Amino acid sequence: MTTIVSVRRNGQVVVGGDGQVSLGNTVMKGNARKVRRLYNGKVLAGFAGGTADAFTLFELFERKLEMHQGHLLKSAVELAKDWRTDRALRKLEAMLIVADEKESLIITGIGDVVQPEEDQILAIGSGGNYALSAARALVENTELSAHEIVEKSLRIAGDICVFTNTNFTIEELPN
């Protein structure tokens, strides 16, 4: 699978992910780009799960953003509704973290839209719990930037999770 983590701190939101693509227990690619900018660079999105499924979801989510003038929550809810009700989409196996300058969300494969806890940290994928734990500890105990926290959290997840590597893509938006 993978690890995607998002941290919002001091007017900055950062989303990062590793580059490993696995097929079963085999590493197929080590430099995939699982974090992207959408909607003219105003929205960050990262995926965990099936690569082809995620690209389909990126396209659908970007269409929703266009349809709803970039309103992140409305677009996420509309995508989740479609994901839940459309037979073809229901078979897609992926999760998304999406963020703009105001909010961050997880969109799940079962059609849920999840907002972060007060700490504004989100993580998904096989290494998500490791990255989430690391990010929370770093936010609570350091003055590191959001970018530094995302990078360190991904590195910790990559050291623990066999489905996560240390080839990162990290994108950020200032507030």
UniProtKB/Swiss-Prot annotation:
* CDD domains per UniProt: protease_HslV (cd01913)
- InterPro entries in the record, alphabetically? ATP-dep_Prtase_HsIV_su (IPR022281), Ntn_hydrolases_N (IPR029055), Proteasome_sua/b (IPR001353), Proteasome_suB-type (IPR023333)
Query: Pfam families per the record?
Result: Proteasome
Tell me the compartments it is located in: Cytoplasm
**What NCBIfam families does the annotation carry?**
ATP_dep_HslV, PRK05456.1
Task: Tell me which family the UniProt entry assigns to this protein.
Answer: Belongs to the peptidase T1B family. HslV subfamily.
Q: What is this protein called?
A: ATP-dependent protease subunit HslV
- Origin organism is Haemophilus influenzae (strain ATCC 51907 / DSM 11121 / KW20 / Rd)
Q: Which gene encodes it?
A: hslV
